[in-house]
Curated annotation (Swiss-Prot):
Top-rank lineage group of the source organism: Bacteria
One GO BP: lysyl-tRNA aminoacylation
Keyword Transport among record annotations: no
Keyword annotations: Aminoacyl-tRNA synthetase, ATP-binding, Cytoplasm, Ligase, Magnesium, Metal-binding, Nucleotide-binding, Protein biosynthesis
Record-linked Pfam families: tRNA-synt_2 (PF00152), tRNA_anti-codon (PF01336)
Location of the protein in the cell: Cytoplasm
Cofactor note: Binds 3 Mg(2+) ions per subunit.
SUPFAM superfamilies: Class II aaRS and biotin synthetases (SSF55681), Nucleic acid-binding proteins (SSF50249)
Amino acids binding Mg(2+) 1: E413, E420
EC class of the enzyme, as a word: ligase
This protein's GO CC annotations: cytosol
Protein name as annotated: Lysine--tRNA ligase
Amino acid sequence: MSEQQNAELDFHGEMAVRREKLAALRAKGNAFPNTFRRDALAQDLHNQYDETDGEQLKEKDLHVAVAGRIMTRRTMGKATFITIQDMSGKIQLYVARDNLPEGVYGEDVKSWDLGDIVGIKGTLFKTKTNELTVKAHEVQLLTKALRPLPDKFHGLSDQETRYRQRYLDLISNEESRRTFVIRSKVIAGIREYFIGKGFIEVETPMLQVIPGGAAARPFVTHHNALDIDMYLRIAPELYLKRLVVGGFERVFELNRNFRNEGVSVRHNPEFTMIEYYQAYADYHDLMDNTEELLRKLALDILGTTIVPYGEYEFDFGKPFERITMHDAVIKYGAEKGIVKEDLYDLDRAKAAAAKLGIEIQKSWGLGSIVNAIFEEVAEHHLIQPTFLMAHPAEISPLARRNDENPEVTDRFELFIGGREIGNGFSELNDAEDQAERFDAQVAAKDAGDDEAMFKDDDFVTALEHGLPPTAGEGLGIDRLAMLFANAPSIRDVILFPAMKHKG
């Protein structure tokens, strides 16, 4: 019999024993009580009393009620040391026969298994090894776990299982719990920052008749009552700008977007973003906001502006570099033979792209080719926080043209570690120019560009009522969480990432 078959037999055998224990509990009455009330968390007790010596604890006679999942246990005759884990951390219990009512230790405590959830009332004391411990006087089994934890709870190392059964990952891996606490702090910190700046938080439609605000392939669904196809939103941008037209001059939305595209270490089809819009501001103001926000998050979450990530350390305390797309291509493409003249002539740009092995789509003009060259030769070099600016108008259909060079826009993307983290620009508020750019997007879509934008006539109508000078930005929450948690994959920071169906 193979080792795997033996393991499966042991697993099913242990489940059978646990079910028998549950049946015995049912026979006694309520097998899943809900009367125990906890008054202390493990980490709070450690914070308060780890430095208190044993004699002082004894004098204080501190009574506590703790609850959590059994992580480890070791029995020595008439006493058992148990470690339980709650949302804050772990604490040790000392459960001895002589400290409990008659029969409780032999009938109840000895039947407990790893993974069971228990409630304990007792007093704090220090062991001979000076470990803070709860001496149990009352015990109660709150939930009987029927399935044993992975590898007797020595850890859960299989990556796919960690993603598919996140609850097991959270039980067994402290680092995963820390990651999602950091994610929560990122979201809370962003919300606090914008509310503190006078922005109001809003919610705009997830189901849209016209999916706009970004170049991406949408998910399509059908509304039965209205008998129309609808789309899961790819971005809230066009609705948020309608609100600025309506007089909400500082507005943000922190919510989900959906894009029917590939899955990778950086991409999940369902993801979280903050998008915000500020009237009477331009893209320079938003770059300043972004630097300020990221410094605040770093200090609040890590206590320093130095952010370690993999082999890198990012310094959020320094001003972020600012460089145009053309300058970045010239700077980092020189070793590949790219020269300035290649970026201003369509035929030369096509030839340069071909040398780099870039497959040019029929719908691409000069701007799209320059962008593809940038992605090939320069993007991965933008390691320290860098604002990439002056994107071609062709690939920026919602951004305001630059006053000095209308071929490019007042737009920026934030790159950290060679990855795009955010995208923002001074908004296009010329309704006629916007209509023309939508028409160009429609032509690109007709030519086979699946990610070209749909035309939104109602948005153009809104612009015709007058959008004040405005700038807006979107920041990827998942990628920020990756950054602050030092997580290598986007799946590590999404509680339940998209996975291929297993069956």
